[in-house]
UniProtKB/Swiss-Prot annotation:
The gene is mrpl-44. Component of the mitochondrial large ribosomal subunit (mt-LSU). GO terms for cellular component: mitochondrial large ribosomal subunit; nucleus. This is Large ribosomal subunit protein mL44. Gene3D superfamilies: 3.30.160.20, Ribonuclease III domain. Keywords: Mitochondrion, Ribonucleoprotein, Ribosomal protein, Transit peptide. Residues 1-21 form a transit peptide. Coiled coil: none annotated. GO terms for biological process: mitochondrial translational elongation; RNA processing. Belongs to the ribonuclease III family. Mitochondrion-specific ribosomal protein mL44 subfamily. CDD domains: DSRM_MRPL44 (cd19874).
Length: 394
């Protein structure tokens, strides 16, 4: 349209430019009203994939068998592994309604037994893989990683990427994490040992990349544990030292602490917002170094991992309680229990008023209070500008 108008203008010195965000006076309010209506109503309800006309359960199972790398498994075995016990309680299944989806006309067994068997198979092969790579780590760490990678949340995420959510036959919709994870476990109960090994290596082991090993196994007293382990290796003296610190009198201080063995060797260092936290993090870093878990650690994936004889690593590693002295606390932190905050607000306010304020003066927001006043040079109404409320520690 603009090109046609420009041609009719001829040689006039006129420039026409279209603005995408230019709206008429009524249109802006209309679009804003539609936006707020959608905010109130919320998102559209989820629609099951099986409700679409191009759904074919048999074809989906055939494609899934090739996608997961086990096309030789029969369709009946897949259906049993993907059938939740609650599926037969659905009204359309109980009433024998024709074309009840997904695939209600086939299979009368559920996956309760396969879930238990598959969970054991997955745990066996995953622990073997972890013992191969983490030979110096205690068995408690191996079990903590195994428990994390095989929980409902992690397995449900893997199942979602594989498209298992659309194939599971269950009463609930949307499908819960527990049902999705149980379907993945049931598949491991159907597969042979070699297929379960490949299933662990191809889909579960890659999740190790996103794991923080210090958070997976949070010891309550890591300094005491690392002290016992170093002394068992011949170290006579263990000492935490402050390497650097900054902002001690600010709201965000930082301390860098290192753990030294025999006053010469730095076995681990880390930073923290307080000395206690920095020592705790440095001790955790020292433990990971002792167990040969570093950022340079190379994990085997794919064919390289499949060629490793993992059957040799069925025996558990050493126990941490055997290496430490009887009085050492080897328990982990229970995050489910509420912990009282160690910060004392009254002490922080008095410290700011007596120490920080005397040294650095007023904060930037207090010195620029006039910048936050209402109104502007255009003298607009108060409805267009809402006065911010800057807050400080004091």
């Amino acid at each position: 349209m603009f090109r046609h108008v420009a041609q009719n203008l001829g040689s006039r010195n006129t420039s026409i430019q279209s603005y995408r965000l230019l709206r008429t006076r009524w249109e802006r309010g209309y679009l804003k009203d539609l936006y707020h209506r959608r905010q109130i109503l919320g998102a559209d309800p989820a629609i099951s994939r099986s409700s679409y006309p191009n759904w074919d359960y048999d074809s989906e199972l055939y494609a899934f068998g090739h996608r997961i790398g086990a096309p030789e498994i029969s369709e009946d075995q897949y259906i049993k592994a993907l059938t939740n016990e609650s599926f037969f309680q659905r009204a359309d299944v109980e009433e024998n309604v024709e074309s009840a989806q997904p695939g209600a006309e086939v299979g009368t067994e559920h996956n309760a037994e396969l879930v238990k068997r598959g969970e054991q198979n997955l745990s066996i092969w995953l622990k073997r893989y972890l013992r191969f790579h983490l030979a110096k780590a205690p068995e408690e760490l191996i079990e903590a990683i195994d428990s994390h990678l095989l929980d409902d949340e992690c397995l449900a995420g893997i199942a979602s990427h594989l498209g298992i959510d659309h194939l599971v036959r269950t009463k609930e919709f949307p499908i819960s994490q527990e049902s999705s994870a149980d379907a993945f476990r049931a598949l491991a109960g159907v597969f042979s040992d070699e297929k379960v090994k490949n299933l662990v290596i191809d889909f579960i082991v890659p999740q190790l990349v996103d794991i923080d090993f210090a958070d997976i196994y949070p010891l309550a007293d890591p300094l005491a544990v690392v002290t016992d382990l170093l002394k068992s290796n011949g170290v006579t003296e263990i000492e935490p030292r402050v390497l650097r610190s900054a902002g001690e009198n600010s709201a965000e201080p930082i301390y860098v602490v290192a753990i030294y063995a025999d006053k010469l060797k730095n076995v681990g260092q880390s930073a923290g917002e307080s000395l206690a936290i920095a020592v705790d993090m440095a001790a955790r870093e020292a433990l990971l170094r002792l167990w040969d878990i570093t950022s340079e650690k190379v994990l085997f994936f794919g064919d390289r991992a499949a060629n490793v004889p993992l059957e040799r690593y069925s025996q558990p590693n050493f126990s941490l309680s055997q290496k430490c002295s009887p009085g050492t606390n080897t328990n982990i932190i229970d995050h489910s229990q509420p912990v009282e905050s160690p910060d004392n607000l009254i002490e922080a306010v008095l410290r700011y008023r007596n120490v920080v304020d005397a040294e650095v003066g007023k904060s930037y927001t207090k010195r620029l209070r006039h910048k936050f006043s209402r109104g502007s040079l255009a003298k607009r109404s108060f409805r267009y500008l809402v006065k911010p409320k800057p807050y400080t520690v004091a």
